Regions:
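N-terminal maturation segment of proteins
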Residues: 1-179
């Protein structure tokens, strides 16, 4: 289930297109039926808890897919950069699968961590390009709030650029294959 829950990638970015959700609907329904067929009567408590967790995750996915559709209605869904650790276990509200958690990086970056960050940053333009086609909803309040998220993300990108240029300019350009 958890492998299915991660969307497939298109041009390196998670695919949240209507076409992708339609294409995967049958597989989701099969997974749901498999879960529902399981007889948990004689299972241990911790195995039943696991079953309930997976069931709750599937219900959440289904609710997002059919009702909330944050990839259609909420520009903030496409916010990728998080400069600070959230005060909740995950992030508040729906979040995409391509987050760059800047606060998790220690500077100076090792070559591997610089490569990780570069890979995460390379996803951003493709995800935002996809957002242009996906965002067709009319949830005005989400659009108003989402604009602020992107102003903040722009500031975050400038901070990252300054920070990385100072400590890793040549290394990062090499990883991003820039002269």
């Amino acid at each position: 289930w958890r492998e299915f829950e991660k969307p497939p990638l298109t041009s390196g970015a998670p695919d949240y297109t209507t076409k992708m959700f339609s294409h995967r609907e049958e597989e989701f329904n099969l997974l749901r039926k498999e879960l529902e067929k399981m007889d948990t009567t004689n299972w241990s408590v911790h195995h039943r808890v696991d079953w309930n967790v997976v069931n709750a995750e599937m219900n959440g996915y289904d609710f997002n897919r059919r009702v909330l559709k944050p990839w259609v209605r909420d520009p903030a869904f496409y916010q990728t950069i998080w400069m600070y650790e959230s005060d909740v276990p995950a992030h508040e509200g729906p979040a995409n699968h391509a987050l760059l958690e800047f606060w998790q990086y220690e500077f100076p970056l090792t070559e591997d961590r610089a490569r990780d960050m570069a890979s995460e940053m390379e996803v951003i333009p493709n995800l935002l390009f996809q957002a242009r086609g996906n965002l067709t909803g009319n949830a005005k309040d989400l659009w108003i709030a989402g604009i602020e998220n992107f102003k903040d993300q722009q500031k975050s990108l400038l901070k990252i650029k300054t920070h990385i240029k100072k400590e890793h300019g040549k290394q990062f350009n090499k990883i991003l294959k820039k002269p």
